[in-house]
């Protein structure tokens, strides 16, 4: 059992501790202070004492109930979202029951059990009361939310009613004010106009007539109607009399609303007064005044200081006639206006025709007919019942707003554009463009294509600025897209082209580098097959282009793309600088790439290094030891001496050039060579210049496109990707691309197909549109101004003097129509590099006292390169002149072949009209041309359809024989007509 003190027990009983101590003393329990402990036995003694003291029998079973209250707080959110605190009071009861047990132990156990039961009951009661308190709090919250919603709805409804009443009152007041103002203004204007007309009719002609300025009415009547309306509106009962605090608040709100409405009405009243004053000032000017005829050159009217009347409107009074700048005696009276305004002058100018018309009708007509002049004020009276709107034309400021400035557009015109697109660019209708083209003499439809020149003329004729746009090529933005997608640039391997004379060891040098650097077991022929390979060295990777690289090098230079970074110039130590070496130097300098000189065959005993250096210096290749920029390497393709040094020099040049390319981007590069394989289809060898080419990418190369189905490296093995400066062989293109074409990877196959299709039909469409737009005057202007044709030549001679003389003689043959271009001129035999150069430049090779070697002849035969050999310079000049003549357009000439006389005309069934003729001279052939002469006058020119001799079709009939001639599409023939036969032959022109 829990032990409590006297003070705690007194608190439970709600009694003072001193009273409880006295009762305990009387009950026989000795407790000295309130802090003494109090046991259950002591409590039972106290209970027995109290029962006996209050007359209760101890034998009766009674119970004592102790009540304890506890208060707690619960936070609950209401409808507005704010937290509300709810007080929860919990009352606990503890009941003590005295039981009569035979023994004290059993009594104690029963008491413990009773206390536990009472504790459980108290807990259940506590839980029930808490739930009840929560339910009450929830009900209270819902009730508060409903009350708040009802109050809000009531407030909104009341506000809506007040707003509608206020708007209705304002609307009625404004309408009344406007009606009254309009009525007053109309009456004033009519009176002023009548007075002005009367004054003008009665006044003498030479005396100046003063302008009639009507007095402005007092503003009080204008204010009266709105004020009365507001007062009457305020007198209406809006709500019942306030009977509670809430009603008092609403009445105060209504009073505040009425005050606000009064303020708004005052503002509107002032605005209406200002508007009415402006209307009166505008209408104050005389609309129809009889004026004397003005002189031819009247002086401008100079108004005096405006006199301000009582109504606040400024007027203008003319000076006397003698004053400087005064008008003529017969001048019209000036209109009343504010200083600085030009309304009177403008209205006078605008209404001059109206005033003249009124003068023609006569000013005394209304009086003669007996009409009152002040009823309507003339047909121009602004305030009349029927002429109110027309009167504004006379003196009011015109509402006409001048048109805004025409906006001039900058139109970028592509090569071809439709009429609809051109109109859209100029922000005009398509019909306007069609009309403009009709004025220019061209009939078009809205969807018809226009060439760039015609479109630019139309744009300029319509007042806009025309600019020639770039080609509307869909791949024009590919470069920008690739630049935008390019990632970080990283170092890439250099691309090296080996050039030089074939006898100087170029092939042997490449073979040694390949066999020493490529892993064992790889087929060497594959590298030759794809034309490019790369070599791994301790210092980096080098990509070599084989002999076809010379051709690709030239083609790439023509396209402006440099695939070659470094050129290795191979020179034999025993031969020195040969003519083909000079060609290689010229190609390298034209492309702007550095040269690394490899002097080969240093192991031969007859090598002369000093002579080689001096010859190279003479050609402009200065070694580094002489202060130049070309490194010289002494190598031997036979022993391998100096190969490592050569590769190091190449890599050193690459480091100086800082060759970088993005790797994490779409691939882009060049087509080195391409062929059509019987089993695999189009196969192209490409050199990746930037990005990474992966299997499955969509490739666009020239006019061909496709998805990479297979990719092989230089060893013939399948590769999944290729980085910058790596050559690979790809399959999957739609057709064979051209060598030297740029290729790029696109993200969308549909876009690649569109670009390839556009490239195929681009020039065809442009030419078609240009032919369609050609006109007769343009044809006359362009006659004789066509682009001159060019004959490219490569000259190889035995000696320098012969080469210079032949080149000078051939250059003198150039004319305005055909020009001679010397691509290359040198001394020596015709080699493979010459044939490659001729292929790239489409030139003719001329050998003067020299011949081509076996390799060059084979290459020339395989690629249809024209080789010409001459021993006499005049023969060379004559043949080149004949070739230039063959490039000229042939001349058409008529050649008469015979004549015939028509002796009879008959009609054959299923054949038509037949001319029975006698061949009088020459002969007549089937399908030849003829002229029909009647009385020695040519009446028709046509073609012979067929010729018959004795019922047999023949090709020709000679002189002295009769034949039947059927003319094609012509039957108007008669006996005695003459037929003249001729043929048109093309004759070659000569220079």
Curated annotation (Swiss-Prot):
It comes from the Bacteria. One of its GO terms (cellular component) is cytosol. Residues 546-549 are annotated as: G3. Residues 323-338 have a biased composition (Low complexity). Residues 636-638 are annotated as: G5. Residues 600-603 are annotated as: G4. The keyword Cytoplasm applies. It is found in: Cytoplasm. Belongs to the TRAFAC class translation factor GTPase superfamily. Classic translation factor GTPase family. IF-2 subfamily. One of the essential components for the initiation of protein synthesis. Protects formylmethionyl-tRNA from spontaneous hydrolysis and promotes its binding to the 30S ribosomal subunits. Also involved in the hydrolysis of GTP during the formation of the 70S ribosomal complex. This is Translation initiation factor IF-2. It comes from Leptothrix cholodnii (strain ATCC 51168 / LMG 8142 / SP-6).
């Amino acid at each position: 059992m829990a032990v409590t003190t006297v003070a705690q027990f007194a608190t439970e009983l709600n009694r003072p501790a001193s009273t409880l101590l006295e009762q305990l003393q009387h009950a026989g329990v000795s407790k000295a202070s309130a802090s003494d402990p109090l046991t259950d036995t002591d409590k039972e003694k106290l209970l027995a004492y109290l029962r006996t003291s209050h007359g209760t029998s101890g034998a009766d079973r009674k119970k004592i109930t102790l009540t304890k209250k506890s208060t707690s707080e619960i936070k609950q959110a209401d409808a507005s979202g704010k937290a509300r605190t709810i007080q929860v009071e919990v009352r606990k009861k503890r009941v003590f029951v005295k039981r009569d047990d035979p023994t004290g132990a059993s009594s104690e156990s029963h008491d413990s059990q009773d206390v536990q039961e009472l504790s459980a009951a108290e807990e259940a009661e506590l839980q029930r009361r808490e739930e009840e308190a929560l339910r009450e709090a929830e009900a209270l919250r819902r009730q508060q939310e409903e009350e708040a919603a009802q109050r809000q709805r009531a407030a909104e409804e009341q506000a809506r009613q007040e707003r509608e009443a206020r708007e209705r009152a304002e609307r009625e007041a404004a309408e009344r004010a406007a009606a009254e103002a309009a009525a007053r203004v109309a009456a004033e204007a009519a009176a002023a106009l009548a007075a002005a007309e009367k004054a003008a009719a009665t006044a003498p002609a030479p005396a100046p007539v003063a302008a009639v300025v009507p007095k402005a009415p007092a503003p009080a009547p204008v204010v009266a109607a709105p004020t009365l309306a507001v007062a009457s509106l305020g007198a209406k009962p809006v709500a019942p009399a306030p009977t509670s605090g809430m009603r008092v608040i609403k009445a105060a709100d209504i009073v505040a609303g009425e005050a606000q409405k009064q303020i708004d009405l005052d503002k509107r009243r002032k605005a209406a007064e200002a508007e009415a004053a402006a209307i009166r000032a505008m209408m104050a000017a005389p609309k129809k005044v009889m004026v004397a005829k003005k002189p031819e050159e009247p002086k401008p009217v100079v108004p005096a200081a405006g006199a301000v009347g009582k109504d606040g409107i400024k007027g203008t009074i003319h000076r006397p006639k003698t004053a400087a700048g005064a008008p003529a005696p017969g001048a019209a009276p000036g209109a009343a206006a504010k200083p600085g305004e030009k309304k009177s002058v403008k209205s006078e100018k605008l209404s001059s025709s109206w005033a003249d018309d009124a003068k023609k009708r006569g000013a005394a007509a209304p009086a003669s007919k007996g009409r009152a002049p002040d009823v309507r004020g003339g047909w121009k009276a602004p305030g009349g019942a029927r002429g109110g709107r027309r009167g504004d034309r006379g003196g009011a400021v015109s509402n006409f707003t001048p048109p805004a400035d025409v906006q001039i557009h900058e139109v970028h015109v592509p090569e071809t554009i439709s009429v609809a697109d051109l109109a859209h660019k100029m922000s005009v209708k398509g019909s306007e463009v069609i009309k403009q083209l009709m004025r220019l003499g061209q009939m078009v439809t809205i969807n018809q294509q226009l060439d760039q020149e015609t479109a630019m003329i139309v744009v300029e004729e319509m007042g806009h600025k025309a600019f020639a746009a770039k080609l509307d090529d869909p791949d024009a933005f590919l470069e920008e897209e690739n630049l935008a997608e390019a990632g970080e640039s990283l170092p890439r391997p250099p691309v090296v082209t080996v050039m030089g004379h074939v006898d100087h060891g170029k092939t042997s040098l490449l073979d040694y580098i390949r066999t020493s650097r490529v892993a064992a077991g790889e087929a060497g022929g594959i590298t030759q097959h794809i034309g490019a390979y790369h070599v791994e060295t301790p210092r980096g990777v080098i990509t070599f282009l084989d002999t076809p690289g010379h051709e690709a090098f030239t083609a790439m230079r023509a396209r402006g793309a440099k695939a070659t970074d470094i050129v290795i110039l191979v020179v034999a130590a025993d031969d020195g600088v040969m003519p083909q070496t000079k060609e290689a130097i010229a190609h390298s300098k034209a492309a702007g790439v550095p040269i690394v000189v490899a002097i080969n065959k240093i192991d031969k005993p007859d090598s002369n290094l000093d002579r080689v250096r001096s010859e190279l210096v003479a050609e402009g290749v200065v070694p580094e030891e002489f202060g130049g920029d070309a490194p010289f390497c002494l190598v031997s393709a036979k022993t391998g001496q100096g190969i490592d040094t050569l590769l190091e020099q190449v890599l050193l040049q690459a480091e100086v050039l800082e060759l970088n390319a993005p790797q994490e981007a779409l691939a882009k590069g060049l087509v080195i060579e391409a062929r059509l394989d019987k089993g695999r289809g189009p196969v192209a060898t490409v050199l990746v210049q930037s990005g990474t080419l992966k299997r499955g990418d969509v490739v666009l190369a020239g006019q061909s496109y496709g998805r990479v189905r297979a990719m092989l490296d230089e060893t013939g093995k399948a590769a999944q990707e290729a980085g910058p400066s790596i050559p690979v062989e790809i399959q999957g293109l739609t057709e064979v691309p051209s060598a030297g074409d740029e290729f790029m990877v696109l993200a969308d196959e549909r876009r690649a197909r569109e670009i390839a299709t556009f490239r195929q039909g681009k020039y065809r469409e442009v030419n078609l549109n240009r032919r369609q737009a050609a006109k007769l005057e343009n044809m006359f202007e362009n006659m004789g101004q066509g682009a001159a044709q060019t004959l490219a030549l490569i000259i190889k001679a035995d000696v320098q003097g012969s080469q210079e003389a032949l080149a000078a003689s051939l250059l003198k043959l150039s004319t305005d129509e055909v020009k001679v271009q010397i691509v290359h001129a040198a001394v020596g035999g015709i080699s493979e590099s010459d044939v490659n150069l001729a292929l790239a430049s489409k030139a003719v090779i001329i050998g003067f006292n020299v011949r081509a070697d076996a390799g060059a002849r084979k290459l020339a035969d395989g690629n249809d390169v024209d080789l010409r050999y001459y021993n006499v310079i005049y023969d060379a000049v004559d043949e080149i002149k004949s070739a230039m003549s063959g490039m000229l357009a042939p001349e058409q000439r008529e050649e008469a072949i015979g004549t015939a006389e028509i002796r009879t005309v008959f009609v054959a069934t299923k054949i038509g009209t037949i001319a029975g003729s006698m061949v009088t001279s020459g002969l007549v052939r089937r399908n030849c041309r003829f002229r029909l002469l009647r009385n020695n006058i040519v009446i028709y020119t046509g073609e012979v359809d067929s010729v018959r001799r004795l019922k047999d079709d023949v090709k020709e009939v000679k002189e002295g024989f009769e034949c039947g001639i059927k003319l094609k599409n012509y039957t108007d023939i008669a006996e005695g007509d003459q037929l003249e036969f001729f043929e048109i032959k093309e004759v070659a022109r000569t220079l």
